[in-house]
């Protein structure tokens, strides 16, 4: 049973409404919840927002006492609110977890350097430990270098693969086995739409999972914001006056996700519940038995337990996606005669540089 906060507060209007809060019936409603159009006051909004996240955490057994948890911190609204709320709920409900901020520096000048400055301020504000790992150190490439070599249209493909592996590598170095990310309901619904548009039905069910992990890896990922609308996260950050970075990534306008996002906006204007509805559809989606068998045939188990033979990262192929992408980049860089000297190694020419591999990852 919901109990509304009783402390009175004067709040600034966001909506021109005259109704009282539909929950406490005592303060003026200033917010219309996007997911159900419920009109509530600011205090009740804080309460239901935090309570819903807590219920998601508890009902899915996301944490256990004594667990070390890394928050994937980018400085944006989602990860900033996630770090704030997770710290708040950990203290309020005594989860007994240790929270660490884990940031990845992709090497995008004018974007990531500014957002990391926000993360460092958050670290001071929330009094949480912070660790930063860079593409430059992990892969000997920055995203700016990758875009210069491979072009902007494929930037999100490269960044998505490398960032996922970078988070795992960072967590492994910190001996942390649980990474939480700020993916929200909008993100998950967009992913479902993207998979449908691409005809990638095999990923539909996985794209809506609140907890994911790779076979053989002790590092799991979870999304406490699975049922949180992006608009509500923005409102929460605004009314809580949280310090976050709001500039879009330099290369994001070329991303295919933008197409799905525009579709979502059109759907939501007609049916506000469409975001949750799409997630529910993904959750209940069952692959045909024939399709399942076809996909299973493509996965080959090797003697080393499905690990990349170059870097040790989990992979269904002999060479993981990251190593394949980096090899292609090195070949392209060699073709345009851009030479990079590897510290401690003799000067190499052309394709010989492709032989350089990532630091071997062990779990």
Swiss-Prot record:
Instruction: Give the UniProt record's GO annotations in the biological process aspect.
Output: protein urmylation; tRNA thio-modification; tRNA wobble position uridine thiolation; tRNA wobble uridine modification
The entry's localization annotation reads: Cytoplasm
The source organism is Vanderwaltozyma polyspora (strain ATCC 22028 / DSM 70294 / BCRC 21397 / CBS 2163 / NBRC 10782 / NRRL Y-8283 / UCD 57-17) (Kluyveromyces polysporus)
Lineage, opening ranks: Eukaryota, Fungi, Dikarya, Ascomycota, Saccharomycotina
EC number(s) for this protein? 2.7.7.-
Query: Which Pfam families would you find in this protein's record?
Result: ATP_bind_3, zn-ribbon_14
Look up the domain of life of the source.
Answer: Eukaryota
Q: Function of this protein?
A: Plays a central role in 2-thiolation of mcm(5)S(2)U at tRNA wobble positions of tRNA(Lys), tRNA(Glu) and tRNA(Gln). Directly binds tRNAs and probably acts by catalyzing adenylation of tRNAs, an intermediate required for 2-thiolation. It is unclear whether it acts as a sulfurtransferase that transfers sulfur from thiocarboxylated URM1 onto the uridine of tRNAs at wobble position. Prior mcm(5) tRNA modification by the elongator complex is required for 2-thiolation. May also be involved in protein urmylation.
Task: Tell me the protein family, please.
Answer: Belongs to the TtcA family. CTU1/NCS6/ATPBD3 subfamily.
UniProt pathway annotation? tRNA modification; 5-methoxycarbonylmethyl-2-thiouridine-tRNA biosynthesis
Record protein name field: Cytoplasmic tRNA 2-thiolation protein 1
Q: Name one GO molecular function term.
A: nucleotidyltransferase activity
Its GO CC terms are:
cytosol; cytosolic tRNA wobble base thiouridylase complex; mitochondrion; peroxisome
Q: Which Gene3D superfamilies match?
A: HUPs
Coiled-coil spans are none
Keyword annotations: Cytoplasm, RNA-binding, Transferase, tRNA processing, tRNA-binding
């Amino acid at each position: 049973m919901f109990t509304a906060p009783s402390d009175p507060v004067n709040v600034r209007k966001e909506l021109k409404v005259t109704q009282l809060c539909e929950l406490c019936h005592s303060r003026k409603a200033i917010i219309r919840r996007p997911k159900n159009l419920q009109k509530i006051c600011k205090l009740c909004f804080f309460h239901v927002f935090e309570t819903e996240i807590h219920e998601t955490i508890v009902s899915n057994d996301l944490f256990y006492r004594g667990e070390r948890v890394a928050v994937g911190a980018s400085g944006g609204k989602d990860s900033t609110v996630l770090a704030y709320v997770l710290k708040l709920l950990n203290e309020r409900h005594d989860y007994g977890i240790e929270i660490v901020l884990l940031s990845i520096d992709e090497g995008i000048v004018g974007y990531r350097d500014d957002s990391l400055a926000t993360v460092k301020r958050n670290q001071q504000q929330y009094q949480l430990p912070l660790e930063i790992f860079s593409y430059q150190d992990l892969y000997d490439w920055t995203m700016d270098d990758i875009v210069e070599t491979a072009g902007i249209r494929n930037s999100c493909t490269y960044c998505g693969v490398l960032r996922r592996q970078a988070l795992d590598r960072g967590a492994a170095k910190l001996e942390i086995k649980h990474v939480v990310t700020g993916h929200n309901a909008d993100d998950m619904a967009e992913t479902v739409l993207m998979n449908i548009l691409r005809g990638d039905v095999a990923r539909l069910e996985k794209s809506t999972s609140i907890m994911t992990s790779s076979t053989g890896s002790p590092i799991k990922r979870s999304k406490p914001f699975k049922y949180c609308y992006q608009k509500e996260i923005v409102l929460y950050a605004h009314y809580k006056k949280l310090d976050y970075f709001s500039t879009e990534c330099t290369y994001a306008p070329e991303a295919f996700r933008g197409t799905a996002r525009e579709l979502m906006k059109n759907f939501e204007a007609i049916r506000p519940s469409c975001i949750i509805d799409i997630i529910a559809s993904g959750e209940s989606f069952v692959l045909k038995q024939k399709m399942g068998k076809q996909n299973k045939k493509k996965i080959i188990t090797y003697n080393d337990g499905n690990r990349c033979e170059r870097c040790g990262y989990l992979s269904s192929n002999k060479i993981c996606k990251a190593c394949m992408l980096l090899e292609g980049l090195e070949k392209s860089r060699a073709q345009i005669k851009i030479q990079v000297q590897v510290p401690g190694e003799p000067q190499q020419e052309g394709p010989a540089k492709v032989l350089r591999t990532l630091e071997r990852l062990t779990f």
